């Protein structure tokens, strides 16, 4: 019977199985984009974005050791009628 991979395991490559293709890419970098028709700029102050970065860092470090606050980048921009919140997390290299 095959063992089912969990979401975080498949994303960060923490299972014993060898990583291939997109799993290796996910190990290197996690990118999340959130789009909203409601204006985010009214709710996202610089302080709130910094708090969000710290909370995200705390969660990511439960699964991947060595991620620093400088590895988390959050950008806000408008695209057509949408507000886009883009987050990039540079992950340390996966050691085999």
Curated annotation (Swiss-Prot):
GO biological process, one term: cell division
SUPFAM superfamilies linked: Cell division protein MinE topological specificity domain (SSF55229)
Record's signal peptide: none
Keywords recorded for this protein, A-Z: Cell cycle, Cell division
Pfam short name (any one): MinE
Family under the similarity heading: Belongs to the MinE family.
Task performed by this protein: Prevents the cell division inhibition by proteins MinC and MinD at internal division sites while permitting inhibition at polar sites. This ensures cell division at the proper site by restricting the formation of a division septum at the midpoint of the long axis of the cell.
Name of the protein this chain belongs to: Cell division topological specificity factor
Organism of this sequence: Psychrobacter arcticus (strain DSM 17307 / VKM B-2377 / 273-4)
């Amino acid at each position: 019977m095959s063992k089912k991979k969990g979401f975080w395991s498949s994303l960060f490559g923490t299972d014993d199985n060898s990583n291939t293709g997109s799993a290796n890419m996910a190990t290197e970098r996690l990118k999340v984009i959130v789009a909203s028709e409601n204006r985010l700029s009214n709710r996202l102050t610089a302080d709130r974005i910094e708090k969000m970065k710290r909370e995200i860092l705390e969660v990511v470090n439960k699964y991947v050791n060595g991620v620093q606050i400088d590895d988390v980048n959050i950008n806000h921009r408008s695209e057509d009628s949408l507000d886009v919140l883009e987050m990039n997390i540079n992950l340390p290299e996966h050691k085999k």
